[in-house]
Amino acid sequence: MSKVSVASVRSNVEQILKGSEEKKRNFTETVELQIGLKNYDPQRDKRFSGTIKLPNVPRPNMAICILGDAHDLDRAKHGGVDAMSVDDLKKLNKNKKLVKKLAKKYDAFIASEVLIKQIPRLLGPGLSKAGKFPSPVSHADDLYGKITEVKSTIKFQLKKVLCLGVAVGHVEMSEEQLIANIMLAVNFLVSLLKKGWQNIGSLVVKSTMGKPHRLY
């Protein structure tokens, strides 16, 4: 049973949107869900990791790069999406610094299905280490549909510290869109936790420059 009601999410979302209206920034603020865990020992308990696709794209400006074969490079070019060929990847020569720079430049990668197995061989473990191993796309898939899917997907991953944050939307969204994203993100997170709600110390939502609003 969810301990966060739609009504409480709504009132917090209203305040976030009102705050961002009053203080307009020259960029679109992201809305983030910040989670504080309790009764969890990252050394002993299983470190969870899970991804979920939200109903509304939380980060429309995400920088995405296609690692493609000829067919997908062509599709990317037509759509004005950044892309790299196998030859481009070979030029990086597994240089750790260059791969790291590539991983920093983009928020996510999509690779042609036929290339996915070659990525570690071409680039080494750099993309995996950055948590940005590419999502596969087949020739039958709609490339733009895939890009939207990647932009809609958020990842909860517990590392060594008991707090984590994920983007659940932005201030240009409607109230309903933000509420839908936040509710789904919260309930999915709880499903990943060993003791569910008993592991949640706090849930806070805030826009990039706005005040934090406590949900739980």
From Swiss-Prot:
Tell me the PROSITE patterns matching this sequence: RIBOSOMAL_L1
Instruction: Indicate where this protein resides in the cell.
Output: Cytoplasm
Which GO terms fall under molecular function for this chain's record? RNA binding; structural constituent of ribosome
Q: Which UniProt keywords apply?
A: Cytoplasm, Phosphoprotein, Ribonucleoprotein, Ribosomal protein
Q: Which positions carry Phosphoserine?
A: S11
Q: Which Pfam families match?
A: Ribosomal_L1
Name the predominant localization: cytoplasm
Annotated S-S bridges: none
List the transmembrane segments: none
InterPro entries named among the record's database cross-references: eL8/uL1-like, Ribosomal_uL1, Ribosomal_uL1-like, Ribosomal_uL1/biogenesis, Ribosomal_uL1_3-a/b-sand, Ribosomal_uL1_CS
GO CC annotation terms, alphabetical: cytosol; cytosolic large ribosomal subunit
Q: Which GO terms describe its biological process?
A: cytoplasmic translation
| Keyword Nucleus assigned | no
Which top-rank group of organisms is this from?
Eukaryota
Its biological purpose is as follows: Component of the ribosome, a large ribonucleoprotein complex responsible for the synthesis of proteins in the cell. The small ribosomal subunit (SSU) binds messenger RNAs (mRNAs) and translates the encoded message by selecting cognate aminoacyl-transfer RNA (tRNA) molecules. The large subunit (LSU) contains the ribosomal catalytic site termed the peptidyl transferase center (PTC), which catalyzes the formation of peptide bonds, thereby polymerizing the amino acids delivered by tRNAs into a polypeptide chain.
Q: What else is known?
A: There are 2 genes for uL1 in S.pombe.
What do we know about how this protein assembles, alone or with others?
Answer: Component of the large ribosomal subunit (LSU). Mature yeast ribosomes consist of a small (40S) and a large (60S) subunit. The 40S small subunit contains 1 molecule of ribosomal RNA (18S rRNA) and at least 33 different proteins. The large 60S subunit contains 3 rRNA molecules (25S, 5.8S and 5S rRNA) and at least 46 different proteins. uL1 forms part of the L1 stalk.
Q: Which family does it belong to?
A: Belongs to the universal ribosomal protein uL1 family.
Protein name per its UniProtKB record: Large ribosomal subunit protein uL1B
Source species: Schizosaccharomyces pombe (strain 972 / ATCC 24843)
